[in-house]
Amino acid sequence: MNRDTIKMLAMATMLVNHIANVLTMCYFLVEGYGYTHSKTQYAGRLFGFAVLAQLPYQLVFPEHGMAGMLRFNMLFTLLLCFLVLAAQEKIHSGFLRVFCIVLLIFASIFCDWALLAPVFTLLFAWAENSRLRKHIAFGVAAVLYGGMAWLSSMRTLGAVGALPDTLGCAMPILVSGFFILYLYNGQRAAQHRGFYKWFFYAFYPGHLLVLGLLRVALLG
């Protein structure tokens, strides 16, 4: 499978399960950061479509008051992840680099996929040139997310009762890892690259707009 086919599958998972999509988008963000001819244009595209997606995002996930105003969609999260990679590459002072990365990770608290997406991005950046490290990165991501789900569920379900939820949260990450590690051929689609490039940006605000309008129509 080429990169664009896997991204199309990730778009489909966005409609049913965001977790697999989080991993896939973070993985290809790291890959795209290394391939892009202009990091400034890459960041600009993320920012532009993040702004376009914000109103549809608030239609789908309405929150009142300050909480609603300070909640941003996942493209803003990916922009923060991009800035994490930029800080890692461009800032030479070890202390300043760590400070900026930690600040960006905590800034994601105000976005969808808070905290986890930047951490996943750092994992994949660490694993970028090593197949063994990629296996480790997906394993750590599954344990990390599954562990968080277990801690959340055990309060009401107990330690054993929370295990099905834990496995349910970890499995999409492992499935995502399987597709990328064993089926991905490291290439982009041979044809219609321009279409795929812009479709992946436009899909997110587009599908949110449709869901938001449906919500307004059905619930008022």
Name each model-derived stretch.
Residues M1-G220:
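Alpha-helical transmembrane segments and their immediate juxtamembrane cytosolic regions
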